[in-house]
Amino acid sequence: MATFGAGCFWGVEETFRQVPGVIDTAVGYMGGTTENPTYEEVCTDKTGHAEVVQVEYDPEQVSYEELLNVFWDNHNPTTLNRQGPDVGTNIARLFFTTLKSKEIPQKNPKRKWIKAGVGKIRL
């Protein structure tokens, strides 16, 4: 299981659904202080939640590192709380790792963005 936030969760979910080896996806919210927030509450930027997609995948077909590459390749990490026309703290870019995968972000494509000189990476 992996969880990513990279903008409006509907588009992010569709992107991950196209990846071979992804079994299922679910959208929701993570972080924040409001228990069981509604979409309307999250969009006020007062709950602290981010829109996320939980990705269930078969590690025999796709690795966490490959999913992380999909994450980096499908959003602009240089704009804070904005992805395309969507703006707000709920549009944060983030990913959550498991104990087994926590070392992977250290060698991820974030470095590719930095080397390309695109500006500050905002997670």
UniProtKB/Swiss-Prot annotation:
MF GO annotations: L-methionine-(S)-S-oxide reductase activity; peptide-methionine (S)-S-oxide reductase activity
Catalytic activity: L-methionyl-[protein] + [thioredoxin]-disulfide + H2O = L-methionyl-(S)-S-oxide-[protein] + [thioredoxin]-dithiol; [thioredoxin]-disulfide + L-methionine + H2O = L-methionine (S)-S-oxide + [thioredoxin]-dithiol
Family per record: Belongs to the MsrA Met sulfoxide reductase family.
Database matches in Pfam families: PMSR
Purpose of the protein: Has an important function as a repair enzyme for proteins that have been inactivated by oxidation. Catalyzes the reversible oxidation-reduction of methionine sulfoxide in proteins to methionine.
Keywords: Oxidoreductase
Entry annotation: catalytic residues: 8
HAMAP family hit by this protein: MsrA
Name by which UniProt lists this protein: Peptide methionine sulfoxide reductase MsrA
EC number: 1.8.4.11
InterPro entries: Met_Sox_Rdtase_MsrA_dom, Met_Sox_Rdtase_MsrA_sf, MsrA_MetSO_reductase
